[in-house]
Regions:
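Active-site-adjacent structural elements that line small-molecule/cofactor binding pockets in enzymes
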Residues: 1-166
Length: 166
């Protein structure tokens, strides 16, 4: 949903500050209301993601490149040669295979053991050897408290909203 040139500039600054210790996880988006807020078509999300990944890869070279008919160069160049590592975040077979086709890693949102197989299978079909997949083994939300009853009164409705709406 973000302009890829502005995003590249912001990521390069973070990459410089972190001296190469950052990773970028991208997503297509999946909530209609977020697309409505940005005046974007939900049906265009895969095409937009593919465009943005291609643009970021070009912009991370530190060279002059053409993006949407504009000749641009992001400076300074990223600390990491070629820019920080990029991954697609998502769940399911379609997302895992898309990450391989984009030539980036895949950060799975759930622990389905088939995800790594789908990603690795698509990488093999494409001859892509530079990627990897991360599949979580545990739940993604953990809250540690010395008084769970008290804290649930404070965070409960927010945690439930997050779980039910995402």
């Amino acid at each position: 949903m973000h302009d890829p040139v502005r995003l590249a500039e912001q990521i390069v600054v973070a990459d410089q500050l972190a001296r190469g210790r950052i990773m970028l996880i991208l997503g297509t988006g999946y909530r209609q209301e977020e697309f409505d807020m940005m005046d974007m078509k939900f049906s265009d999300r895969l095409e937009v993601l593919e465009h943005h990944v291609a643009a970021l890869k070009k912009l991370f070279t530190g060279e002059h490149v053409e993006i949407d008919g504009r000749r641009l160069r992001v400076t300074p160049a990223p600390f990491s040669p070629g820019g920080p590592m990029m991954m697609l975040g998502g769940s399911g077979e379609k997302a895992a295979r898309l990450a391989a086709r984009l030539g980036i890693g895949f950060a799975a949102a759930d622990s389905n053991p088939m995800i790594a197989d789908w990603y690795n299978d698509e990488c093999a079909k494409l001859g892509f050897t530079g990627g990897f997949v991360v599949v979580p083994e545990k739940l993604g939300f953990i809250h540690v408290s010395d008084d769970p009853e008290r804290d649930w009164d404070i965070i409960g409705r927010h945690a439930l909203w997050d779980a039910q709406s995402y």
